[in-house]
């Protein structure tokens, strides 16, 4: 089998390919996959991974790392909005700047765009109307299960999976929120004064360090 990554852009401009199986079989298709793969400065985004389902295994871990990436971005957004009080315009600017440096990536880029999308059926931006409930295809869970089987710590990826589980419990979360409010536990974070520029820089550094951890955990599983 062969893992494929790249989405719509990959289909148009070349994907990242992770072929597995026998090396003899790979040699038959090597010329083809090298040509259709995405091309970067140091060569095509394809390499022979190994026997059997090794290619699909790497793709599974790739998705697990991406789970971690998305959760880290979500938490960075939450801190900037909830603690820093950044507007969607300011969030868009911050993520746009981040995408010019060490955090440059597809996920950071599209996140910056999301903040600027207007709600064509109401006021404000669409990001504030998105249902805070997510689903999953299973590859993140498989990655965490495999890490456990191998006795390998993957806390960032595992925490991102837990967050998805909690995300699905919307009714329970809303009920718990009412209990907290009835107990007099309000939103004290909104009363905190912070230096926005300092917070943006601190969150950028924290996000970068956390992403390195997520990638390291995935590579350790492989």
Whereabouts are the PLM-identified features?
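Solvent-exposed, charged interface segments at domain starts and junctions
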Residues: 93-98, 156-160
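A conserved active-site cap/scaffold subdomain adjacent to cofactor or substrate pockets
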Residues: 126-214
